[in-house]
Amino acid sequence: MEEIDKSISFDGRDIRLKVGLFAPQAGGAVMIESGDTAVLVTATTAKGREGIDFLPLLVDYEERLYAGGKIPGGFLRREGRPPEKVTLTSRLIDRPLRPLFPSWLRDDIQIVATTLSMDEEVPPDVLAVTGSSVAVLLAKLPFYGPMAAVRVGLVGDDFIINPTYREVKNGDLDLVVAGSPQGVIMVEAGANQLPEQDIIEAIDFGYEAVCDLIQAQREIIAEMGIELVELEPPEVDPTLENYIKEKATEQIKEILSQYDLDKNQRDEKLDEIKDSLAESITELPEEEAVRAMVESESMLLGNAFKSVTKKLMRQQIVAEGIRVDGRKLDEVRPVSCRVGVLPSRVHGSSLFNRGLTQVMSAVTLGTPGDAQELADDLHPQDEKRYLHHYNFPPFSVGETKPLRQPGRREIGHGALAERALIPVIPKSDIFPYVIRVVSEVLSSNGSTSMGSVCASTLGLMDAGVPIVKPVSGAAMGLIKEDEEVRILTDIQGIEDFLGDMDFKVAGTDSGITALQMDMKITGLPIEVIADAIHQAKPARIHILDKMLSVLDLPRPDMSPYAPRLLSFKIDPEMIGLVIGPGGKTIKGITEETGVKIDIDDDGTVTIAAADGEKAKQACNIIQGMTKKLNPGDVYVGRVTRIIPIGAFVEVFAGKEGMVHISQIADYRVGKVEDELAIGDEVIVKVREIDSKGRVNLTRLNIHPDEAAAARANAMNY
């Protein structure tokens, strides 16, 4: 294969596409590079399996630790279970790619993206998304592309394409835009309460760069003599669908217009119609085509019935502006909330209901030592102080399934809800706790991730976390029939399943904190996306008002079972003194007081205890140890050693000075032991600190007021 190397520049940063050199047996392969980050993306296909009614697309993203010059930990020294970032990147590649394959395609397709080199500036995820499109084109698969993705950052007042890690961290926006020639196809964003118009402009800015990358892909395949594969869909025999339309259209319409039915009732009635159709088909003569079709393939009837139902529901929304539950296009389902739904052993809890969707969130407050360390990870990132985990048990949709580890969907939904709250989590110097929120989906009928955002907000406030502002979220949908477009507010399950878009928007009353948009069509113009973003705001504010009617401010007090934290700074040079040889000193403090102590490299000490008084005791011990002594200071100390020329007195844990025999009393002392014994409590004054740092103490010339103040201070230590 001919080797081609094509480069395109954004804001002085090049993206290079190299084809024809790597993975010659893959259907298509490209090395996509920027800076020292390089990702190999391959696309391979195999003949489809019998009896499946979906596109078997498998997307895997992997990172090799040698890409960052690292050797894996553990006994085997091999990459182990992939970190969460790998799962999220796999989803990021899959989401814009899947809608661009024909809906009728049934071939097995596997995309493998592997980061082979990585610097500390360029994230590999958006490179992998663009690379997946190139690989598919080279594999000559049916594809409505090309497709590309870029990241948009906000530095000052300027948008930039593909910002570095540092620029993303220091900015107010982290937005990924993916698009096709037909328009924007995916959006993923975290933002620091940015106004809607800023987000819209950022998406538009990003799509312009996407178009440049699409053109670069077109030039590559043109140079290689490859044409876009756009096959005609296989002919579908309309006989069965026509039979269903003739026999059941009016019945289905009647069910779809019974607005008082809930999800389960509607599903049951539709199933009854389908079962009745199945029974009527079995009564047809054997030579009838409809009967022969259904008997030859069991899934045909169900698929055809879904197709007819989908078309009728969409027609109802477009023509009448009324949804299956009777709502208008911009109407939110009934919302109700509660807080403190679990006993106070759980540090904070809430229950959020929107229609038949119900999410319970539980909040746990931990110490800085509970922060999540991202081990064996290539990505430069601080420890995570805020963690959100999302669980979706089978009973939430009335199903029975084995319970497994969280899948890609659960990890993705948890990350989205986490991202929505991060901008309002208080800084560690204000609230030093590590926070974990677990959202349990107890009932699902659409938009559980946004339900998790709302439940998390209320749970945090119930736990007494002083969040900057409360956050709410809503999921927007879309029905597109030819040139007719209808945007739906707060979509439920059937609208998500039968619609064309799932657009989740979360934020405060000041602006957006998170976005996630996925399509089932091949792209949308920015104008439609802008309308959806603007339509989401009144829905978010309506939901927020309902939440604040239950709890409008964070509780002033935390659960009595939450750990009490005291945080203060010491001189970093004193850290070794506090820890002691082999950890002896700090271990002694923890054993004496029963607290947990964390010390950061910058000298920040955080003490956690169930008993606030114990935390204060440990705090006073450490502050005393690290306090610098000054001449003239008076302390209550304890005699630790006696030598012929004087006595050593410990004024703080680990800090002592010597009282010379001449400074013990205002008269001549023959032997130190005549005046002092080991363990005696004495009042001493710092006389001097010599050039070697040795502390000389005295018992002379101490005013009674100084002695009284020293005794008062000693009671606090």
From Swiss-Prot:
InterPro entries: ExoRNase_PH_dom1, ExoRNase_PH_dom2, ExoRNase_PH_dom2_sf, KH_dom, KH_dom_type_1, KH_dom_type_1_sf, NA-bd_OB-fold, PNPase. SMART domains: KH, S1. Pfam families: KH_1, PNPase, RNase_PH, RNase_PH_C, S1. SUPFAM superfamilies: Eukaryotic type KH-domain (KH-domain type I), Nucleic acid-binding proteins, Polynucleotide phosphorylase/guanosine pentaphosphate synthase (PNPase/GPSI), domain 3, Ribonuclease PH domain 2-like, Ribosomal protein S5 domain 2-like. One of its GO terms (molecular function) is RNA binding. Mg(2+) binds at residues 496, 502. It comes from the Bacteria. The keyword Magnesium applies. It catalyses: RNA(n+1) + phosphate = RNA(n) + a ribonucleoside 5'-diphosphate. It is found in: Cytoplasm. Involved in mRNA degradation. Catalyzes the phosphorolysis of single-stranded polyribonucleotides processively in the 3'- to 5'-direction. This is Polyribonucleotide nucleotidyltransferase. It comes from Trichodesmium erythraeum (strain IMS101).
